[in-house]
């Protein structure tokens, strides 16, 4: 994600958009952009659902899209006309030099969001208010000396679509939703959508870059790093979550091999073929701490004029010192939405921290990655939670009926199939998210 858009002014079509394309001709039929000039990593996390609904007696072939901000948009499939009202609402301007945040963003006005939309001071968890705060990608980071309340007061928290600033902006719901990659399930028999959601606050912070240095090559390379690499590998190259530490990368790479990885990518890392030779050489010099690299001053100045004035990066989740979210629960939910009427039917916590439940806390829900599956027997099956359970819910009431401890987190959407007259459900147990152990198994269940 790019959190500074001073060099890409405008709405930035067709990013963050749903496109209807004629599959035979490739012609665009209609489109809808959900976020203009995205500064918050609000890409669409999941595929849309093709649905048939009954709105005031009219049968409509529609398409529904869930979003990271926790909203559900529904359109007529043929022409892209919204089924329920959408309003372009005004949001604050950016305080960063050169940034021109788009003045409005579209929000549904009928279907309620599936995640809370603003983290206020009153929503700080009573149980953790006096504990130390932690801004970290995972639950095992280093706590600050400030309490959660003190840290909250230091940050900007004003709801959706507040542009990044140098103080730090709370993005809530966070960069992983709202809805996430598992997407939603839709029941054609009753017009109800079932979707899980996250309610985790994250912090987004801008840092002004200074390109005046006794070693302009290294300094310029540091600027390139902050713009393109720090959101994953950390501002100080120390790594985070599943992204490696780069501070000693010179033990394993030279300039040629490192530049090849930067350009072409490796594993989950995308490549950066857009970097020119000067940018690539400077970045390589910075990462390898090679102060001997020389670039002609004229060439460096010409390139540096294109450099962005800020590095805007994800600082991490806003947690307490024990790794629990700073906001009061629920931290993850499962939701049923009647898309015939645009109404939420029920909402229940999804997942739990067993150590908190044992102390008498109500189920808090957890962050979740992976979607639901509906059966014909009025059941919803879902893994997704960081407690590692696979669960079944009553689709009419949201009551949790059953759970099974998986060998690793089921951060995937289950599938179902039939063999020899018997129905099975399978979920991939890859784990690895949210600081949980990785796994390599598929687990299958028989529906008897």
Where are the regions that the model predicts?
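Repeat-solenoid scaffold signature
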Residues: 37-123, 176-181, 185, 274-282, ...
């Amino acid at each position: 994600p790019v959190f500074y858009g001073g060099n890409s002014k405008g709405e930035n079509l067709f990013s963050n958009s749903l496109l209807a394309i004629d599959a035979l001709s490739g012609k665009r039929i209609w489109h809808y952009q959900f976020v203009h000039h995205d500064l918050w990593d609000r890409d669409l996390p999941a595929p849309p659902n093709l649905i048939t609904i009954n709105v005031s007696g009219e049968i409509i072939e529609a398409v529904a899209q869930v979003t990271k901000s926790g909203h559900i948009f529904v359109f007529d499939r043929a022409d892209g006309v919204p089924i329920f009202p959408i309003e372009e609402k005004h949001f604050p301007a950016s305080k960063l030099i050169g940034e021109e945040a788009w003045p409005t963003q579209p929000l549904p006005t009928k279907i309620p969001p599936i995640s809370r939309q603003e983290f206020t001071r009153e929503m700080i968890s009573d149980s953790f208010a006096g504990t130390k705060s932690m801004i970290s990608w995972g639950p095992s980071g280093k706590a600050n000396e400030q309490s959660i309340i003190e840290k909250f007061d230091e940050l900007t928290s004003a709801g959706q679509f507040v542009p990044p600033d140098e103080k730090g902006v709370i993005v809530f719901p966070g960069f992983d939703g709202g809805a996430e990659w598992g997407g939603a399930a839709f029941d054609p028999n009753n017009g109800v959508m079932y979707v899980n959601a996250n309610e985790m606050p994250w912090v987004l912070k801008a840092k002004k870059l200074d390109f005046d240095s006794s070693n302009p090559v290294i300094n310029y390379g540091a600027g390139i790093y902050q713009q393109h690499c720090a959101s994953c590998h950390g501002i100080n190259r120390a790594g985070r979550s599943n992204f490696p530490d780069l501070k000693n990368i010179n033990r394993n790479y030279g300039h040629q091999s490192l530049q090849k990885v930067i350009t072409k990518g490796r594993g989950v890392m995308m490549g950066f073929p857009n970097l020119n030779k000067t940018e690539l050489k400077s970045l390589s010099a910075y990462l390898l701490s090679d102060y001997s690299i020389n670039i002609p001053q004229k060439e460096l100045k010409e390139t540096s004029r294109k450099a962005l004035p800020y590095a805007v990066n994800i600082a991490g989740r806003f947690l307490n010192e024990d790794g629990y979210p700073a906001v009061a629960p629920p931290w993850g939910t499962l939701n049923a939405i009647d898309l015939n009427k645009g109404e939420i039917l029920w909402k229940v916590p999804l997942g739990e921290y067993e150590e908190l439940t044992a102390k008498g806390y109500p189920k808090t829900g957890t962050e979740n990655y992976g979607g639901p599956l509906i059966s014909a027997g009025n059941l919803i099956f879902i893994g997704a939670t960081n407690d590692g359970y696979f669960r079944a819910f009553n689709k009419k009431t949201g009551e949790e009926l059953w759970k099974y401890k998986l060998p690793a987190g089921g951060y995937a959407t289950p599938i179902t199939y039939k063999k020899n007259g018997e129905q099975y459900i399978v979920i991939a147990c890859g784990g690895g998210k949210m600081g949980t152990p990785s796994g390599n198994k598929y687990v299958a269940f028989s529906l008897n």
